[in-house]
Amino acid sequence: MNAEQQYIDLFSQTEAMICQHSTEVMNTPRATAFADFERLGFPTRKQEKYKYTDVSKFFEPDYGLNLNRLDIPVNPYEVFKCDVPNMSTSLYFVVNDAFYNKALPAPHLPDGVIFGSLKEMAAKHPELVKKYYGKLADTSKDGVTAFNTAFAQDGVLLYIPKNVALERPIQLVNILRGDVNFLVNRRVLIVLEDGAQARMLVCDHAMDAVNFLATQVIEVFVGENAVFDLYELEETHTSTVRISNMYVKQEANSNVLLNGMTLHNGTSRNTTEVLLAGEGAEINFCGMAIADKNQHVDNNTSIDHAVPNCTSNELFKYVLDDQSVGAFAGLVLVRPDAQHTNSQQTNRNLCATREARMYTQPQLEIYADDVKCSHGATVGQLDENALFYMRQRGIPAREARLLLMFAFVNEVIDTIRLDALKDRLHLLVEKRFRGELNKCQGCAICK
């Protein structure tokens, strides 16, 4: 039995159970998503978008799923302690694919802000969730998005009303927890109305040393003049596979910063599609990956300049050691009416060994003539002249290598607009390069 068939059979047998433990808003598109999954199947290397990562093979093993929504015997508020100096956040948890709401802290959110379980919030605010859920994540075009939509039962909703600004960042910690190999399907819906402002930090952790497979679909709507910063920090273990699809839509004069940082993982496959739908919208999109052993990190991005006078800046950097593999494919599309577009895309990569492999594919599609667009990609090794220069001045060879690698990724870290997080990332990256880090030293949740 192939991977698709086992999940087709599973859905057919358990559809009623899946719907029973979810909500009407999430159940409504479920049948269509399942039909799309039956038609599309899991992506393979035969598809251009997935040619650097064979996603289908990760679904072949047997995984446990919590379709009955059984309680997880862990209180994350008792075992998690984020001690990043000078960083004050509103802290929340998702355990596997369920929002943890049994010991919520005292709310620090302004009036009108909605944050919590997607399932519960959809029951309380059905028209709001219905307006946005599934409107960016097109199940007819991507097998993973279709699969996630068919099986997801809960998730997270963040809604910020017009002209409301969150003073404190929201910190969402995704915890993978299981005694057997486990599959989770996470869903995130983020809506900022016109003039709203928010910052969000999402941290991925795995508590147990079993095989985890996590699919994730994130939809982000950013209204006119709204400002949103989203930081994703992945620190799981080498038996974890994460397949994440993010869809972002920006209206006029909105400003978004996306920063995805992979410090430790097994396999990460991240797709991000950004639609600049209103004039004056700006996206600053950064990513960093540090990989060693047989780790694999693949980022596939697209930025659609659909209207005039928009700006996009994209910067991705990889440092690959041992036999690790990295991939970056980035498309910038400038449509015929999108005059006065300003776009810059850069991908720089450092292979610390001859065995490490990096695939890079920057792309520009420009159908307007009054634009300023550039792209570039480099793959190289450490600068031998710089190493020689540093050793001549008494710096040991290993220390010189570490200094050069740290300087290489520092440009991405410096885009972070939370000073406390930026300072902690400098420390974590240094420890990662020294081989001293396989989990966040700023918390006590991972084994």
Language-model region placement:
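Short, low-to-moderate order helix/coil transition modules at the start of elongated helical scaffolds
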Residues: 1-217, 227
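Conserved beta-strand/loop scaffold segments within soluble protein domains that form the structured core
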Residues: 124-388, 392-395, 409, 413-447
